[in-house]
Design a protein with these regions (language model features):
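DNA major-groove recognition helix of helix-turn-helix/homeodomain DNA-binding modules
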Residues: 45-60
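Short amphipathic recognition helices of helix-turn-helix/homeodomain-type DNA-binding modules
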Residues: 60-66
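Short alpha-helical DNA-recognition segment
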Residues: 16-33
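A short, Lys/Arg-rich alpha-helix, primarily the initiator
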Residues: 1-13
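Residue-level signal for the short linker/turn that defines the boundary of a DNA-recognition helix
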Residues: 5, 15-16, 42-45
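Alpha-helical residues within the helix-turn-helix
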Residues: 12, 23, 52
Length: 66
């Protein structure tokens, strides 16, 4: 099972820097960048925090692929 996401697209559309997003959700810039690139599996907590920050549903930010 793999996760894809729209984090970078949403962040850039809203003019949010990766550093600012990371600070706002309580994760390192390195972690946010890694998840944006699809280099890791996001935790449930990460998905909830970022979705809440964007005021979006988790499934609108993250997608599960088999």
């Amino acid at each position: 099972m793999a996760f894809t996401n729209n984090i970078r697209e949403i962040r850039e559309q809203r003019g949010i820097y990766q550093d600012d997003l990371a600070t706002a959700i309580g994760y390192s810039t390195k972690t946010v960048g890694r998840i944006e690139r699809g280099d890791g599996t996001p935790s449930a907590e990460f998905m909830l925090r970022i979705s809440k920050y964007f005021d979006m549903l988790v499934e609108d930010v993250f997608h599960v692929e088999d």
